[in-house]
Structures are given as C-alpha cells and as structure tokens.
Amino acid sequence: MQIRERYPLPEKANIIMDTTYFGRSFGVMVLMDSISQQALSVDEVKYETNALYAAALDALKEKGFEIQNIVCDGRKGLLQMFPEIPAQLCQFHQVKTVSRYLTRNPKTAAGKALWRLTFTLKDSGKTAFQGALQAWFEQHEGFLNERTVNEESGSSHYTHKTLRSAYLSLKRNLDYLFTFEAHPELGMCNTT
C-alpha cells in the first residue's frame, strides 16, 4: 500500500512498529516514525511475522532512511534480528504478557507481589527495577521452584508454571525494556 506524502519525509527515523488485527486473518502492519509522527510503511498482512518486519525495515533502508532505533511488541526473535540497531521492547506489551500468565487477579502472594512489581515498570529505571525483581526472586525462590510429582510416572514438573513464566519473561526481556535509558540522545519511546 502506498502512503501519500503530506510532509517531507525524515532522513533519520525512530521506528515504532506493530500490527493490529481486524478479525482473525486481516491485519495492518505499520512502521511509524516517532519523531515526525508519520507512518513510513503500511501493509496489509494475514499473519504477523519477523520476516515481514525485516522486509519492511529493509525497504525503508533502501529508500534512504537511517533507522536510529526500533520500538516493538517483543515478538520472539525480532529484537535479536537487528543487533546493530538499538531496540526497545514496549513496556505496555510486557505488562500484557505478565497479565496473560498471572491474570489480573493473581491468587498467590508471590503472584500478587510480581503483578504489583510489574506495574512499577513504567515509572522505574533499569537499575531500580532489576534490583526489585531480584529481591522478589530471592523472597519467593523456594515457592517458584516447588515441584509436583506425578505418582503414576514418577516425573515431576514445576508447580507454579505460569508464575515462573511471568518472572522469566521479565528477567529475559530486562535488557530490552530499558534501551531508551541507554540512548537518551535518540529520544526513544518506551512503548508502542
């Protein structure tokens, strides 16, 4: 799809990229420059894939755009595809990921504490959030590592799988949740 050019296009772009779905198999993938507030690429897509995002970014580079940074929803492998470009994982999407694992009303004390901690993300710096996440882990490590044994097979699995998944998601994504702090000169957003 072609975008009508109303304003001069920027030479440098801070890319916010996301796909919005209308129904199950029709989506619109948009790459927008957060500086000029212009959509630089708009495509109809059936599915959201890393290959489509890579192709859209390559097309922008071929048009002469210098991609200064990327803010995205954190699809698996997407942030690692562009090691030369500072990439920020959308903090709002990270909160949604934790919500998917814990629900909005966790039942356990550990889950409630992690849910409250997750809500401090937007107001925290990396060092403070990392320290609070580590303190949460140290307080709840035993609970997090509890295992349940299947009496028939003798095999075991983690009892609190969704809590572990929520914690590990935050821990794994920590470096990408605060990229904007490491590059203040770029004026990066922390959310899509």
Task: Briefly describe each language-model feature range.
Residues 1-2, 33, 62, 93, ...:
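Intrinsic structural disorder
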Residues 69-118:
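Conserved beta-strand -> loop -> alpha-helix junction used to position metal-binding or nucleic-acid-contacting
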Residues 49-53, 90, 122-129:
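Intrinsic-disorder/low-complexity, polar/charged segments
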Residues 1-76, 80-85, 173:
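RNase H-like nuclease fold core
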Residues 65, 72-76, 116-192:
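Acidic/histidine-rich catalytic cores and adjacent linkers
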Residues 38, 55, 78, 88, ...:
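Residue-level signal for alpha-helical context at structural boundaries
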Residues 15, 90, 190-192:
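Short conserved micro-motifs on helix faces and helix-strand junctions that flank
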